[in-house]
Design a protein with these regions (language model features):
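Conserved active-site and SAM-binding loop architecture
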Residues: 1-251
């Protein structure tokens, strides 16, 4: 894929990808609702921008309701690490009335908890669909990331099958095995594989990571991406660029 413009990295932890794009000579900026690492270029309510931009695609296109998408062209690329807090396999366990974390809750509170979580999950699902719709309907290029473990909610009849599933991210230098899906919208991935295995002493378990502090904000520790993985993913699947490290194969 040729990127003549800029890369726009959305949501938490996207700064790692931003930095690696810049190292590869491609201009990049990141956007998020918070700035916990002091490096976010644009602190914005991404959900609001997605909602408003989707409305523009199906209503009057002459509306002056400006969003961040107005400055993104077809020569650019959006890389979105969409919040997985309601889609991950760990999240699906929270939908059970008998989940161990609810053992001290009265039954009426358990029902309210599950119903509230179900409503939030539907809201986030619609936002993800709208983000993909905005890009497909306007021809803007997008790569969306989300977990793809056994019980992941998005396996249950999502609107598109993933373009790529990376079943073991440690093979490309990440901290977690963490099976992950990537959807390429208005573009196609390249198919390289740079083998750079992570030292086993540095591999982490998702279940041991700290949870999120509030709804809509993913766990920082679970969402962490190593710079090595970001660079290898960019070169293997976005740029089709052979590197001088590791071993590159094609499948």
């Amino acid at each position: 894929m040729e990127i003549k413009g800029k890369v726009h990295c959305f949501f938490e932890q996207s700064g790692t990808f931003k930095n690696e794009f810049i190292k590869l000579g491609i201009p990049a900026e990141d956007y998020d609702i918070q700035d916990n690492f002091g490096q976010t270029d644009h602190i914005v309510d991404l959900f609001s921008h997605i909602e408003r931009e989707y409305d523009k695609t199906r209503q009057d296109k002459t509306r002056q309701d400006k969003t961040i998408f107005d400055d993104i062209t077809k020569d650019d690329l959006i890389v979105a690490f969409f919040p997985c807090i309601y889609f991950s396999s760990l999240s699906q366990m929270e939908m059970s009335l008998t989940d161990v974390n609810k053992r001290k809750m009265p039954m009426n509170e358990r029902y309210e908890f599950v119903l509230n979580r179900s409503r939030n999950r539907q809201k986030f699902l619609e936002l993800l669909i709208k983000l993909m719709g905005v890009c497909e309907l306007t021809g803007k290029r997008l790569v969306v990331e989300n977990p793809w473990a056994m019980q992941t909610y998005l396996k249950n009849g999502f609107i598109k099958s993933p373009s790529i599933v990376d079943n073991d991210r440690t093979r490309r230098g990440d901290f977690f095995v963490k099976p992950t899906a990537f959807w390429f919208v208005s573009c196609e991935p390249t198919n390289g594989f740079t083998y750079q295995p992570t030292d086993m002493s540095k591999v982490k378990n998702v279940r041991d990571a700290k949870g999120a502090k509030q709804a809509g904000i993913c766990s920082e520790e679970r969402s962490m991406i190593s710079p090595d993985y970001a660079r290898n993913f960019i070169c293997d699947f976005i740029l089709g660029k052979k590197q001088d490290i590791g071993q590159l194969s094609f499948f």
